[in-house]
């Protein structure tokens, strides 16, 4: 595969059933509705910062379990109780992760205090065995509490999100945090509708391997496109700054040019991949700067 350490487990899956579920709508009145869903399904919420279909790798992420979502009055809601599906290389052999689980709930509504804004609050729980961190591997029990402010205003668009994580990792208290933002302004009256954008993200890293805490942020099932379409780095012990310019030279073409700079949040913690594996330990270098990436995308 050309990858150091060989192919990832997610790189091969001959034939798989990504989605197979039953759905029921027990309530519908005007715009209000409730949907219940059970079975194997893909899940993706918000900007995929914590839960996504793993777009960018060779196989997609599915989940087995229950989901309820809908709208009641001015409130939208989503709840899930599922087990992640492990990717295996054969035909129809993917299975629910042993000892793993994921559950979460979120509500969102329009926010009159923000320009064309909306607010989402959420909480989730994740249990996973054999999770790799710079301090070692073990069972990770983690609760995430977050809030997101977002808008799809034709001129000013923004997505700002942040939160904390608490839990336990092999007797260590988990105390992690994260912040993510993507802000842009589109000059709708100009030729090509140019958009200037700026993304700034920061995720905590472990400060001291001997203080009885684990401070490394766990991005759970985040989109692998965090570090661009190549998906080489993940949002753990990292911060980045990414300016961009988008424009349409013709009606059916959108061009985006950008640059991304990556740094370690803590020089005492390692560098993590988009799937959460440890790519470099924190003891081999004290440098914070990881590297830069330049991107060009035509859609």
Please identify what each model-predicted range represents.
Residues 99-106, 224, 228-248:
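Outer-membrane beta-barrel signature, preferentially recognizing the C-terminal barrel domain
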Residues 28-36, 50, 54-213, 248, ...:
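Signature for the C-terminal beta-barrel architecture of outer-membrane proteins
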Residues 236-278:
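Exposed, low-structure sequence patches enriched in small/polar residues
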Residues 214-235, 266-284:
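Flexible internal linker/loop segments at domain or repeat junctions
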Residues 2-63:
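Well-ordered mid-protein domain cores that form the structural environment of catalytic cofactors
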């Amino acid at each position: 595969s050309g990858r150091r350490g060989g192919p990832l487990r997610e790189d091969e899956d001959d034939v798989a059933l990504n989605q197979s579920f039953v759905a029921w709508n027990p309530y519908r009145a005007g715009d209000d509705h409730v949907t219940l869903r059970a079975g194997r399904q893909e899940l993706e919420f918000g900007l995929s910062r914590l839960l996504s279909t793993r777009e960018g790798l060779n196989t997609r992420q599915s989940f087995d379990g229950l989901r309820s979502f809908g709208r009641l009055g001015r409130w939208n809601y989503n709840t899930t109780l599922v087990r992640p599906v492990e990717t295996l290389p054969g035909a129809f052999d993917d299975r629910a992760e042993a000892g793993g689980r994921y559950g979460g709930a979120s509500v969102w509504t329009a926010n009159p205090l923000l320009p064309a804004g909306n607010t989402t609050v959420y909480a989730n729980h994740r249990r996973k065995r054999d999770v790799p961190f710079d301090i070692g591997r073990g069972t990770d029990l983690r609760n995430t509490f977050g809030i997101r402010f977002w808008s799809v205003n034709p001129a000013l668009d923004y997505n700002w999100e942040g939160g904390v994580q608490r839990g336990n990792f092999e007797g260590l208290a988990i105390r992690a945090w994260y912040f993510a933002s993507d802000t842009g302004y589109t000059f709708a009256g100009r030729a090509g509708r140019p958009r200037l954008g700026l993304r700034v993200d920061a995720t905590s890293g472990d400060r001291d391997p001997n203080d009885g805490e684990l401070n490394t942020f766990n991005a759970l099932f985040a989109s692998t496109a965090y570090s661009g379409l190549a998906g080489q780095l993940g949002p753990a012990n990292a911060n980045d700054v990414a300016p961009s310019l988008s424009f349409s030279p013709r009606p059916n073409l959108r061009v985006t040019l950008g640059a991304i700079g990556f740094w370690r949040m803590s020089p005492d913690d390692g560098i993590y991949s988009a799937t959460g594996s440890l790519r470099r330990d924190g003891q081999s270098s004290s440098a914070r700067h990881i590297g830069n990436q330049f991107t060009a995308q035509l859609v």
